[in-house]
Every structure is written in structure tokens, then in C-alpha cells.
Amino acid sequence: MNFKLFGKSAPGGKTTETAQRTILTYSLSDKGGKQINDDTAAIFRNGGNVRVFVGDGLGGYAGGKQASEAAAKALKAACRGNMHTDAQLIQAAADANRAVFDLQKRTGGKMKTTMVFLSLEKDTARWMHVGDTRLYIFKDGVRVFQTADHSVSYMAVLMGEITMDQIRFHEDRNRVLRALGGENAKPELSAPRTLEDGEYTFLMCTDGFWEYVKEDEMERTLAESKTPEEWILAMEKILLTRVTTDNDNYTAAAVFCR
């Protein structure tokens, strides 16, 4: 199964048309109540392939911003080739991690970044993530998968101490256990997922976004939206009714496979 690509949101994005499927993308990133936006969203295209990166930089004083941008730049370079096998994904993650470490050496800082990365090639999706930036997958409008956070609060969920919904405002929600540029930067890789008949939707978002938009609201607004731009903006409206004046940066990227 081939894809028809329609890219509205990525700056400089191209439109490539093949057969059978249409891919629409959109991304949004906002500094929220902070002075600096440490998040980065990037959408890459290579022929008929689409790759999406979302990262949440850690470190403050613009260091987090530099880290997430460095990781995105390294992954963009890696995306010039195929990104289908475990070895290719692991190497791409290693390149991104090295870029953050090189940044630390040059600046003397301790900046890090979380990451979620999605690769769509032909009829196959693969992804990897580090930290608490999430990927959600919806099939025909129903959530069928989400990544597991690498965080202290998610460990509390696994131990039965709190529920998944309580993770949103848990006292340890900002303590990530894995990050690029950190001691543990090992990505969690997915197995290849074949996109069978039906409509697939992918949402990648930082904690500043998913903390304020619940999964049932993601499904409801998805059902009411014709494009990824409509969907993300509908979810942002929900977010803006709930955030405080000093809320975190928030970033989301969506892919519609139709």
C-alpha cells in the first residue's frame, strides 16, 4: 500500500502524490507561560516517506531549546536514508544523543531532551521514544496504543500507587528516567506496525500538552475534525481553559493517514 502525502504544516514541506492513501500533517508548539520554548517539533519528508520528531528540552536558560533542536537536526540528517530496521533507528537515536552530548561539551551545560520519533515508510509505521513525550495511535478514531513514559510517576502507575489519569499532576511527573544527553538515553523501539485497511491517526505531544487533554477528549475532538490542524487546535482550546499563567511549553504534531 502506497501513500499520498499532503503536507500543510511543516515549513517548506512538499506535496507528493502517489496512490491509495493521503497523509496530512500539522504541528503546533507554544511557549505557554514560560519565557523560552524548549520544545521542538519537526516533520521531515524523503520521497514517499514521512518522519516526525517531537522533543521537550530540559536544562533551562535556553539549554533545553538547544538540546531539542540539536536532536531534531541530527534525526533530519539520519532521515536521508531508510529508517526501517532496528539498527537504523538505533543509529539515528545514537546520532541524536551524540549531538546533545557535543552541545554539552561546547557549552559546559547539562541540557537534555526527551524524544518521540515516528517513521512512516510505505505501509509500515515504526517509532521510538525516550522520556515522557508521548505517541498515541488511533485506528478509525479509537485509541489503540500509547507509549509508556520513562518517568518516576509512570513507575508509580506500574506499581499500582496511582492511576494513569493521576499521573498528569503527580508530584514526580517531571522526573524523567531517560533523556538524550543523560546517563540513560536508550530509546524504546516499536516493532514494525503494518497499516491495514482503515484510518490511522498519530499524535505526538509533550507533557505540557497531554497533561491538560484527556484521552477521551482526544477521541471526541478527532471525530469532529477533518484535518490534523482542526484537531490540534480543538485540543489546544481545551488546554487553554485549564492551564495556569505559568504553564509549561506545549507541543503537538499530528499525522492523518486516510
Question: PLM ranges: what are they?
Answer:
Residues M1-R258:
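PP2C/PPM-type serine/threonine phosphatase catalytic domain
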